[in-house]
Amino acid sequence: MYMKIRSVFSCLLISAVSMLAARAADQLEGRAVLPAATFAQGPTSGQQLGPNPINGQPVPFLNKQPVQGFSAVQDNGDGTFNVMPDNGFGALENSADFHLRVYHIQPDFKTKDGGSGTISVLGFFELRDPDKRIPFTITEQFTDERILTGADFDIESMQRAADGTLWFGDEFGPFLLHTDASGKVLEAPFHLPDFDNPGKEIRAPQNPFNEEATTVRIMNAARHHARLHGNNKAPVCSPWEVMLDDGNANTFVDNRQAPPVGSGLAPASSEIHNIASIQAAGYPVVTYTVDNTARMTELLTLKINGIISDRSDLLYGAVASYDANADGTPGDYLDADGLIDIAKIDAQGHRGSRDLRPENTLPAMEAGLDNLMTTLETDCGITSDGIPILSHDPHIQAQKCSRTDGVPYEDVAAEVLIKDLTVAEIQEQFRCDKLFRGPTQQNDPALSPVTVDFFGGDASQIYVLPTLQQLFDFVTFYTTYYRTGPGSGHPMATKRWKNAQRVRFNVETKVNPRTDEDPLHPGQIFALRTIEPTPFAQKVANVIVSNGMQERADIQSFDFRTLLVVQEQFPQIRTVYLFGDFPKFDDPAIAGSDDGTNMQPQAGAGPNTPWMAGMFWPYRSTKLTQPFRAQTSGGFEGMAITPDKHRLLPLLEKPLAGDDQRTILMHEFDLASSSYTGNRFKYQFDPRGVSIGDFILTDEEHGLIIERDNTQGNLNGFKAVYKITLGAPGTFVNKELAVDLLRISDPHRISEPGQPGDVGIGRNFAFPFTTIEDVLFFDQKHIGVLNDNNFPFSVGRHVGSGQPDDEEFIIIKLDRPL
């Protein structure tokens, strides 16, 4: 019995050794390398990559596009190949300036018989959407060609159909994208149905049909539009503070959490605008309106760029007491003069300081200046004589203002429109000094000595609605008042004049694009209560320019049409994009109904909001009703096409939420009907695997899949090509190891010479890259493999020098036929 067991053991050992030898005997037959720092013509890219340099590579890439990140390959049958980079730099936030392209390359493989081992780039074409097939906002939204970028799609796979058109698998949706042979989009992207949850879709966190992924897309389009017109100031994103994705369950929009009966609204998450994501994309985040110290401190901790507050006194106190570096000493956001450092936080007095003085009046602005705000936030209307005047509303509101002649002015329905009166008429007939915001709001002229002095001592004038020009004049007057005038002896004089001489302005254009009726003012159409958006923006901007305030004044709006005008005609002025959800209810008589600002579509006027200049906002489609089952970078990574060219089999890179976390899915897509069949196949990871890199079919039922871990430069890592066999739909594919990519024989030393400290070069060749995303089938004994070099981030080969990985294209001769 002992001898029998020993004999069996010996046989098993010999078999195991033979298998290892077979794997190690897979042989490097050819290798070609495209240097990491290879570039093609194109606009500057990599502007959001962060610290410079990265792995020795200077960034950004001025007036050029890197040829890198190959994630799909096609054999043209003539010694050339088409290779497809992915989205560029790995994230939606940092890839808006990376053009989606397909490059035409020709490798001259180094083999035992010779060859240079180089790759020539012969040309490229770009993916583009001139026919506007894509329904959501893209970076080049406002161009004719609409070239697609890595912030629009993360394409990871590519197949050519029988008709010569191209199909791309995307991770952001995940989507299938269909183009002609030149890269022009032919139809809207195809969603992936969630067959486990009928009526739902499989969505990733970057899906543009969820609100959560839309803010950055809109800001990208806004910035690109600005740059087209010479405005190189990054626009500001200004979301409502209760709609920040901050993980605070106590901040939400009431009518999102519990829509009133009769409102016609759907419930939705309020966790929409992610501060870190927006900032990573290159946009300052200034939130409104925050009026308690605890919340201010919370937002400072979240590294917000700016806070707008009705309580300028509390805001200064919160900033002054903030200990950013936790060393026990507050004041980290103050400069040497004790003033707020705007580079660290922009503290804005909302409508001056509306909880301290009547809003949008000079006393309110004086309060904001007294409390050392870095910015005075305000709103403008346009009078009948074309003058910008400070007002949040198109009417002279009865709640805020009274008539100077004593005639009662209480009926909201009878309120006068600003556009129907001249400045002189408004300032002669109305005073806006009513108190309704609580006990901290006061209108005693003694509290506003600078304003009284500005009006020559006539306290009866201080609560007129001032013009924008008067605001600029007042700030200059205030500076002099405390520097050399009556206030120069005040204990705060130095801080006040120093702050006032540099204070900024954030001026809102109060325009409403809706064409339905304002229920508070029967017979009035929202859009007709003010002048048109273009002259509105022009008149505000002209005052800024005439005062030389282009570096100190921003123009903000919920109506993005006005901001596009500013970018086009006044490129020295920075724009601020306001986001909020103040819906008009189906029954506007229900308490809380508002004017539709600025996400809500207008009833009967199409599915999109009229506020965002045609950019798409997926109103109230959030993770509450459409959760994210696909992971970030977990969408379509590999995609096979059947030999008859009838079906695609896109394969998810990572498991879905709610599924077994070692299993990923292939979905079958019928090209004739352009629809998913519902057939799915399961693929199970090796215990070491975390992602797949590519998937192709070699015949009707067999294929190759690259599977990997996340290591780089590690010869003990896991990088493998598996041969798979499809079974019946719904079952696991059978898999067996075809190539261990870290154990390839190089008896002819094709891979040499390398650089000092290179990993995996020489007789024992390896492909030690983080991501390996391309596999080609040549014949039963030969396959091709390419890495995705993640330029300039990954260092898997050149560990010794620390230089970024090159693109490598290898041909492997298999020890055993497929």
PLM feature spans:
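Bacterial N-terminal signal peptides that target proteins for export
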Residues: 1-10
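Intrinsic-disorder-associated interaction segments
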Residues: 2, 461-464, 731-734
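Bacterial Sec-dependent N-terminal signal peptides
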Residues: 8, 21-25
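Bacterial N-terminal signal peptides
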Residues: 10-18
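Short helix-loop boundary/capping segments at the starts of domains
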Residues: 14, 75, 79, 108-111, ...
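Sequence/structural signature of beta-propeller domains
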Residues: 24-217, 227, 589, 605-818
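Phosphate-group recognition and catalysis centered on beta-loop-alpha active-site segments
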Residues: 206, 212-613, 633
